[in-house]
Design a protein with these regions (language model features):
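Contiguous mid-protein beta-loop-alpha structural module that forms a pocket-lining wall or clamp
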Residues: 1-55, 60
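Ligand-binding loop in jelly-roll beta-barrel domains
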Residues: 16-35, 144, 148, 156-184
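C-terminal amphipathic alpha-helical segment
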Residues: 37-119
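Glycine- and acidic-residue-biased ligand/ion/polar-headgroup-sensing regions
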Residues: 23, 110-142, 148-150
Length: 184
């Protein structure tokens, strides 16, 4: 077992055996989360159809990278966070994914309206701290919309600049979003 806490970032490249454990909320950021998952065990959980979710021990065992020991995981995959910017208004952290992944992730902490740029990629974001925020277009290309804690939202690349503002019960409080983009 590897202890984790809220906002830890765990990199899980293909072939790494893992499970979330009890009482954990997991935000999985992946290009193919269900296509290539080989479940070795699923704790008796059922799918939307009410039937046990499939496990595939034989195929899964062929996918395991057996050199990924507990020590290797602790040294290489746990919370490799780098602070890119830290001002009174904004903290930006590169949380990254494993170097083999083509997705880049950054976490943003702020307590007032903050401008973002799509950086020539579709943006997938999730509100990971705070109760709600409003997403607005700088140029009016879309109607403002409110997102709530743990909700995921997408901003198309063609939008360019957009703003995120804490609102409602999060107004004037620090919130955080994690943003995933395709590395260019």
């Amino acid at each position: 077992k590897i202890p984790i806490k809220k906002h830890d970032h765990v990199l899980i490249p293909a072939g790494t055996i893992h499970c979330s454990g009890s009482d954990a909320m997991v935000l999985e950021i992946s290009a193919t989360p269900y296509i290539f998952t080989m479940k070795l065990w699923d704790w008796g959980r059922v799918g939307l159809d009410g039937k046990p979710r499939p496990v595939n021990i034989e195929r899964g065992s062929h996918s395991i990278q057996y050199d990924r020991t507990t020590k290797w995981v602790k040294d290489n995959l746990i919370s490799d966070i780098k602070v890119l910017e830290d001002t009174k208004d904004l903290k930006v952290e590169k949380t990254g994914l494993h170097e083999l992944e083509f997705i880049e992730t950054k976490r943003y902490w702020f307590d007032k309206k903050t401008t973002f740029n799509t950086e020539e990629s579709v943006n997938m974001l999730n509100l990971i701290e705070g109760e709600e925020a409003v997403i607005t277009s700088v140029d009016g290309s879309f109607e403002p919309y409110v997102v709530h804690y743990a909700e995921t939202f997408i901003v198309p690349e063609c939008v360019g600049e957009y703003e995120i503002t804490p609102c409602g019960r999060s107004e004037n409080k620090q919130i955080a979003v994690i943003k995933a983009t395709v590395q260019v």
